[in-house]
Amino acid sequence: MFSASDDAALGPINCRWPSVAACVYYVFKAILDPELPPNAGAYSPFEIIVRDGSVLSAIYPMAVCNANIITTQRITDVLLGALSHAVPERVQAACSGTMNLLNIGGTNPKSGVLYNYIETYAGGQGAMHDLDGMDAIQNHMTNTRNAPVEAIEAAYPLIVEKYGLLPDSEGPGEYRGGVGITRVLRTQGDVQLTLSSDRETVPPWGLFGGDDARPSKCEVIDPDGVIERLPS
């Protein structure tokens, strides 16, 4: 079913067959019987076809490190969107579409010890035909929790200046999607930052007449107040 997928990307967003299979099994289990214990018999009816060298079946030396952070989230959205034509009462609109992996590393200016802060940032769940989406959760192929502010500030030379739900970030409609979060971190000393994220250009889409959600945004503000918006 995935044989027409694009060729593998230059960046690290490619994945392999097991990741694709996990998405397929997850979506159909959620739709058909969420209480069914995972078992080989439930998976045996599926024939999952991918094309080697494509974004969903990378071969060496194609990079795959962001497969679960971004690509599997997109696969589940695509499957749910396709199935909305067959079982509209069992699917949801697009979710935040990424785990939003933020990594900040540097040297603690007080102790001189190297540190590495890494966390995934939640987003909104897509709305369903008769139910609002949940706010600020990790969707589909992930199950991580948020780190408490106190834990971050105790373990790292970081100050959490703002953390909360982001009003009006959801997709509006008779049933709305879940809202995302906003967090502002202040670093101390020189750091290196990497971000694995998406949905900055193409926002999560609505279903059944519901509108799209707001796109994501990540900005770096330097000591002089100059703002740089990071690409997804």
Q: Can you say where each PLM-predicted feature lies in the sequence?
A:
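Glycine/proline-enriched, intrinsically flexible loops and inter-domain linkers
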Residues: 1-232
